[in-house]
Amino acid sequence: MLIEFGEQSGEKQVVIVGAGFGGLACAKKLRKSRSCRVTLIDRNPYQLFSPLLYQVATASLPEDDIAFPIRTAYREVQFVRGEVSNIDTTAKTLTMSNGKTISYDDLILAVGSEGATYGIPGVSENTFQMKSVHDARDIRRSLLRTYEDVEDGILPLERLNVVIVGGGPTGVELAGAVSELQREIQREFEHIAPKATVTLLEAGPRLLPSFHPNSSKYTQKN
């Protein structure tokens, strides 16, 4: 099945794959143009405000507070939910995972990035990434389940140490939020909460390496 959204009006068909910050910024600017029709494709029907994922991961914010429906916010953009399985640049078509084909005149790929493991054995299998709502949900479940299991004697006290790799803004924010969560659970887990710790690892000489050194010093002290 071939879908050509702009065929009847003669408009240029611009397809954007990825509804992250980059894809949505393009869609917002292009939709103001009367000379093109914009189609936005993403596997999720919502815009994710990823800088606040750490708050979802530590039960500080509900998921709905950082996920905004794309169809509601961008009514002038044709939204297609799904995943692209193939791109034919000669025919200028995209094939979706459900078998449907979408034609385009111009294609913008804004699919984002994946967490880097740097080829370190065991990273993918034994750590949590934090790139999506599902990742944040998994972290939250694991944290709360670990507290319960240590309290019940199923897991040893050593499992209360949360290790965060990466001393950039996300790592620092997550470390602070986990520390706050550990303080908040003291009433429910008064016997084990004092044993809970957070370890933040950074390969470079200081935290927040992209920030001013004074910010790094302040962060490290606090």
Q: Where are the model-predicted features located?
A:
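FAD-binding core/adjacent interface of flavoenzyme oxidoreductases
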Residues: 1-11, 78-163
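Beta1-alpha1 glycine-rich phosphate/pyrophosphate-binding loop at the start
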Residues: 2-79, 85, 172-211
